[in-house]
């Protein structure tokens, strides 16, 4: 939709190209309950709408024609196709032949392919785009909407950016969209929060469907932004960040010699009982419970830190895009596994004065079943390493997450995270800095 003129001025000054789009959107007339049914659609080829939509094109062009930032005109959004929108294109071409015209809706009716100067689609899969680009097309390709950044999402951006580097005719895409639409209000607890649909007592609402930006409504960056920043940088800048991360990871993975006096290691005292294994060192002690499926106690300087035995974690809160593709139902077995994981026994792998290593084995009630292990390594210097191991099995549903639930006795205020910055996931981690 046309924006306020100040935004166009800023784009002119900062070298930001834009597609200027008329305020035309009518997908409610031809898209019924998600299905395409264009037997009656607006504006279509209805003569009573033709002058109206051409007037919208004229108003936008006359207002914005002198903005250097405007690279392309767009006839509108999600309004199917027909003679009326074709008339808009003809007006743009006649009045301003220096600029191209964009429109996505012709993908639903190729009889009106002449409306647009480029192939434009929404949310096309990378292999669909590749298929188009390999077919020796006459028109360049643009994704007028992609990534669908609802809530905490925007995974898999790499697949699209790499297309732009491989195919000259792939012109990139527009993330849907930039900023959440939300309003400050006071919630039932008296807190000032950003509210969306349903937070204001209304019953007919789209709920959080307005929360689709890469920044929040107050302009603060959402977790996805660090990956957007990474993939929208030049290939050279991305390579530089990858090199920095590789060096940092290599340094973190090796033992660094301390410049001053090394910490003295006191021999570990190991006590083996029928139901427990005790490990005691300088200022710390641990108790591993055979029956309790993990550590029963972790004390440092006499203070207990462990609330309950750690457990493997297989579930996380579902996101908007998860729910949109039915993922919570497909992966529901992992929610059950997260709660009902079975304990299969403890094995002492090593028990000496310098190191104690204990393995706890778990069965995962998926179909087919799987297994996991938590391995605790206690070193004489007082370090505790926890390794979580999941043994994958063919045929199991997609795994939402894998980690360790580690509940402490009270809040922990002094922690150091060694890993990637921000919120990362297998398909959204390249922007993280080590």
Positions of the model-derived regions?
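Beta-strand/loop-rich accessory regions of lumenal/periplasmic or secreted enzymes
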Residues: 244-434
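Extended substrate-binding grooves/exosites of carbohydrate-active enzymes
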Residues: 1-253, 257
């Amino acid at each position: 939709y046309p924006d306020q003129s100040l935004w166009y001025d800023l784009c002119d000054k900062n070298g930001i190209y834009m597609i200027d789009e008329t305020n035309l959107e009518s997908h409610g007339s031809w898209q019924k309950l998600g299905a395409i049914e264009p037997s009656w659609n607006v504006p279509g080829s209805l003569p009573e709408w033709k002058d109206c939509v051409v007037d919208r094109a004229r108003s936008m062009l006359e207002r914005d024609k002198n903005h250097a930032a405007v690279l392309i005109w767009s006839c509108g959004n999600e309004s199917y196709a027909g003679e009326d929108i074709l008339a808009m294109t003809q007006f743009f071409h006649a009045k301003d032949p220096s600029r191209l015209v964009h429109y996505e809706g012709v993908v639903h009716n190729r009889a009106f392919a002449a409306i647009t100067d480029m192939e434009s689609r929404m949310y096309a899969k990378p292999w669909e785009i590749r298929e188009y680009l390999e077919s020796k097309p006459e028109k360049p390709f643009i994704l007028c909407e992609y990534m669908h950044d609802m809530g905490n999402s925007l995974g898999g951006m790499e697949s699209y950016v790499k297309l732009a580097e491989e195919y000259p005719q792939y012109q990139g895409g527009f993330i849907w969209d930039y900023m959440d639409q939300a309003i400050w209000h006071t919630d039932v607890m008296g807190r000032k929060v950003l509210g969306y649909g349903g937070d204001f007592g209304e019953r007919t609402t789209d709920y959080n469907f307005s929360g689709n930006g890469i920044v929040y409504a107050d302009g603060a960056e959402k977790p996805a932004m660090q990956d957007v920043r990474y993939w929208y940088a030049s290939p050279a800048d991305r390579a530089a960040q990858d090199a920095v991360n590789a060096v940092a990871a290599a340094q973190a993975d090796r033992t660094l010699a301390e410049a001053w006096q090394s910490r003295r290691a006191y021999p570990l005292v190991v006590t083996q009982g029928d139901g427990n294994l005790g490990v005691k060192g300088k200022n710390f002690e641990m108790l591993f419970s055979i029956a309790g499926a993990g550590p029963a106690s972790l004390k440092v300087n006499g203070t207990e830190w462990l609330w309950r035995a750690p457990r493997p974690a297989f579930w996380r809160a579902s996101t908007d895009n998860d729910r949109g593709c039915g993922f919570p139902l497909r992966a529901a077995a992992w929610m059950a596994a997260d709660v009902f994981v079975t304990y299969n026994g403890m094995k002492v792998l090593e028990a000496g004065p310098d190191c104690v290593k204990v393995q706890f084995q778990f069965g995962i009630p998926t179909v087919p079943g799987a297994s996991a292990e938590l391995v605790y390594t206690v070193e004489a210097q007082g370090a505790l390493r926890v390794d979580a191991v999941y043994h994958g099995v063919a045929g199991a549903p997609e795994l939402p997450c894998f980690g360790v639930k580690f509940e402490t006795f009270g809040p922990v205020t002094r922690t150091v995270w060694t890993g990637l910055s921000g919120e990362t996931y297998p398909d959204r981690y390249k922007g993280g800095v080590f």
